Design a protein with these regions (language model features):
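Conserved structural motif at the start of ABC-family nucleotide-binding domains
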Residues: 5, 19-21, 75
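The feature captures the beta-strand-to-loop junction immediately N-terminal to the Walker
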Residues: 32-37
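Helix-to-loop junction immediately C-terminal to a conserved catalytic motif
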Residues: 50
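Conserved ABC transporter NBD signature motif
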Residues: 58-69, 73-74
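ABC-family P-loop ATPase nucleotide-binding domains
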Residues: 76, 80-139
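Catalytic Walker B motif of ABC-type/P-loop ATPase nucleotide-binding domains
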Residues: 151-155
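ABC transporter nucleotide-binding domain
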Residues: 169-253
């Protein structure tokens, strides 16, 4: 298997927070959704991978090359979209296109104008006159017009209306139809990740709790409601976390097929990415 991104032993220490020995791999042609609550370290990790902040690591490889010493070549193949525009608000889309044509050797002006037209963006209007949604459309138009092999999104769909978010997800699906294209996407809108992710990586308090395939989460994880008797009878290893109220237990389990064999009448709901995150962060662990 070829990997677009390989991180080993990445560390970043602040006074009251730090990334703790992060290691992860992202196969080529796949979408990895990075989840975690605000302040968990998602943006710090992405900034460290991009070289925007200093950090320590054993190895950081992108497209099979060590990032250190190959930054210029690698950055040609990466596009990054944050949750706000990175362009001067006095620039117009036409002017931005001219600038980027001199930055990227594989800039495709025809594709750029195709996206501007598709997003119905006024080409001669300054960005300061754009709404947030229009500015983010501008970011996507620019990012996708130099044919990046790795697209990194840091909360890029936050604050957008559902219609445009759905359009962006369609565009990202089109993008990954090319097996050379890979996406690393951080988002607190977990329903978006449910729709397009091949892998999910969960970071909490600067620590990577797991990286799993989306199919594995769908097949194995579930949420069940039960009383004390059933809760006590569950295999402790099958319980990821639980929440208790006056009505009983709501339990996040990681082996729903095995549990169904033992408790055939027990109803187990499909766990969403949001369920996994909420229970692991706010739920209780079994002793």
């Amino acid at each position: 298997m070829e990997f677009a991104l390989e991180v080993k032993g990445l560390r970043k220490t602040y006074k009251e927070f730090g990334l703790k020995n992060i290691s992860m791999k992202l196969p080529k042609g796949c979408v990895l959704g990075l989840i975690g609550e605000n302040g968990s370290g998602k943006s710090t990790l992405l900034n460290a991978i991009l070289g925007l902040i200093e950090c320590d690591y054993e190895s950081l490889r992108i497209f099979g090359q060590e990032y250190a010493g190959n930054e210029k070549q690698i950055k040609e193949e990466i596009a990054v979209i944050f949750d706000k525009t990175c362009y001067d608000l006095n620039f117009t889309p036409l002017f931005i296109g001219k600038i980027l044509s001199n930055v990227y050797s594989n800039w495709d002006m025809e594709k750029y104008h195709m996206y501007l037209d598709r997003f119905e963006l006024p080409k001669k209007k300054k960005l300061k006159e754009f709404s947030k949604g229009m500015k983010m459309k501008m970011e996507f138009a620019a990012a996708l017009s130099h044919d990046p092999k790795l697209l990194i999104l840091d909360e890029a769909t936050s604050g957008l209306d559902p219609v445009f978010r759905d359009e962006i997800l369609d565009i990202l699906r089109e993008y990954t139809e090319d097996e050379e294209h890979t996406i690393l996407m951080s988002s607190h809108i977990t329903s978006d990740l449910d729709k397009i992710s091949d892998y999910i990586a969960f970071i909490h308090a600067g620590e990577l709790l797991f990286t799993k395939t989306y199919d594995e989460l769908q097949e194995n994880y579930g949420v069940l409601n039960c009383g004390q008797r059933i809760f006590d009878a569950l295999n402790r290893e099958d319980i990821e976390a639980y929440r208790k109220d006056t009505y009983g237990y709501r339990v996040l389990v990681n082996n729903k097929q095995g549990i169904r064999k033992v408790f055939s009448d027990l109803e187990i709901e499909q766990a969403t990415i949001e369920d996994v995150m909420l229970y692991c962060v706010r739920g209780e662990k079994v002793a």
